[in-house]
């Protein structure tokens, strides 16, 4: 799919959008930013989807959190620390027995408990984690990966995820939707999130890939999504208006689901087969002991998941489980026919959701299966041959549309719907109609029955109002119970103890009314938008003529399954932020540790290569380095967990330094090391020393040439030169050079003596290489320092020139002021003027009156008479070097 089909242009904002397909078993994400247009967020292993869940372990007092594919190896070892398939627990309570039983079967070792809000939490190592918090951690890890991806593509660093859209099952009720929104509120994304149904997501993705739609003729399709939790069917229509620039119309007409069909049920069936075969071979093991062993059950379920994938493409799958129970390794083979036999009597339920969608339509079209243009498959388990066979029987093989990427169609569509909702990016226009799956009603305290606000099939988002006649006598409170179908989802409680008296007083002779406005928002969350108190003063007025009295804002909400309060959101969010910070610190330490380990193992390989080339020769340097590497590797094995990032980086630098030294030895093994070769080194070293002395003499001569001029204006050029060197941190180079010359001179004497006595011919290879390397290092260092000193001398001389010219300018200015003074000045002033004139005359008696001639690095004079204007520009230069001396002038 070309991006040009989807995007017209990006609006000039810096908010990135993240679409998430939050599945029960796996997660996929797609990021959209000005520099990353609809790109899948890859896992750390560069895969396009990740495992849904988290593993939390307390290791030596440190909380470690693991995500994604790493959970696969941890769930079989630490099932009690692993929380997977969390989506099924959102918005549920411990009273949902079927949900709890199914979850514990799929997740052996999980310790479920109830929160004070009547929701579910998972206890891990004695700590209670609300499901919303666990989901938030999972989502935050994806958000962090998306932000890292953006950072790699956008170097400005100002673009990051601020908006999120999440694909969810259409049948999610309000408690489940609110729980997911609460989980998002715990992440770093603070903007409102948009929830997109799976079926609509597929419909959007499919619509934008269909250029051949008939004009003004609705085409009907069914999205059949066989995911982990259930088989779901979404009926929708596509219509292309005659004006091709007008938006394509996408209308949702029906939905149904079947919980007895889905990936988890298929996996459970295969797990039962594995369990039966194991018990048949190992008769001493009881089924009870096997079922009650969390690790064994986790291993069986993991093997069943892999077998399901294999059986979708092959007639049989090999199961191999190490140390299943009591160190017993188990290996068996499962045939596809064995798996299908389990569902033989209930195969018809596979397509039950499709029949349900056709039989319970929410629109007026009322189509039949024959009117369907095609069935779009989605979800990983739609690949199961039995599923496709049953669909083909129902609608015909030709109507199964297989040109859709079943794995990514949901994330594509959910991302586009989210972009349309937020408007951050301009996309191809779509006219989308969604309908509610439930009735939404309200019951006010004192009323005998509830009133329907939004009927099943109502288009949303939507608003509606109900006008209630207020009771003659108010009690302490008014309560409005909101219902989704027959389930109470929210109680809005209004304290009327004080306010009702004010209302009655304002409407003494009339009738009070309460106008309650309800909202079914874009996330299909039903709530009261506002309550307005009105007065019909004469009892006969029309509603639009009622007198406004008050708006009720102070509403307390309560329900059986409570959402997170603002205080709980802050508390749980702060905890996640703290863990995230510690994770980042631990990650940085681990990355440094990985670098150190790689360095040490690389050094060990290098040592082996060195020894092979060295043959029978022995080097103390090599022995020392070998001992160093061995010691550090042993230290890491026992103490790596206690090392700080600073300690690790220090050891990395030390390792690299020693490795570099040994590398120079290695590269010198084949070098020429005779008397003539060392004589060449001696000659080169002598030239470097001579060069230093020449530079020193030349620099001193430069200062002597300027000494007289500086003395005339009252400055000591040598003192100023040394002061500038010190303030520019240049003096340390001279000290280093002097020390290196002293060392190099000693080495020259030592080698000359060795050559003269021919003792050099008897030196060991290691000592010869040491001497050669010492020569080379000292010569290279001194040559570098010579170049640095020459350059620094030029800079200092330039600063001295600025200093001199500023001083001369000040003298000229003073002379001009004295000349302009009136003749009535006292004798002392005349004497000062005479001194100034004499001072200036002496300073300018030879050469140019406003500049000092500069000399190049070879000692030749360079004309410095570019004019007073250029000198004044240099004097006014606001560079940091020049400003150092302002206080001295």
UniProtKB/Swiss-Prot annotation:
Q: Where is this region: Disordered?
A: 811-889
Naming one, the record's GO cellular component terms include: endoplasmic reticulum lumen
Which protein family is it in? Belongs to the heat shock protein 70 family.
Q: What class of enzyme is it?
A: hydrolase
Listed name of the protein: Heat shock protein 70 homolog LHS1
Superkingdom of source:
Eukaryota
Q: Which GO terms describe its molecular function?
A: adenyl-nucleotide exchange factor activity; ATP binding; ATP hydrolysis activity; ATP-dependent protein folding chaperone; unfolded protein binding
Keywords, A to Z, come to: ATP-binding, Chaperone, Endoplasmic reticulum, Glycoprotein, Hydrolase, Nucleotide-binding, Signal
What's the EC number here? 3.6.1.-
Signal peptide: which range, if any?
1-15
> Prevents secretion from ER: where is this motif?
886-889
Entry-listed glycosylation sites: 111, 366, 462, 502, 515, 716, 752
Can you state which reaction this protein catalyses? ATP + H2O = ADP + phosphate + H(+)
Mention one GO biological process in which this protein takes part, according to its record.
endoplasmic reticulum unfolded protein response
Report the protein's function. Chaperone required for protein translocation and folding in the endoplasmic reticulum.
Note the InterPro entries from the entry: ATPase_NBD, Heat_shock_70_CS, HSP70_peptide-bd_sf, Hsp_70_fam
Q: Where is the composition biased (Acidic residues)?
A: 820-833, 868-889
Localisation: Endoplasmic reticulum lumen
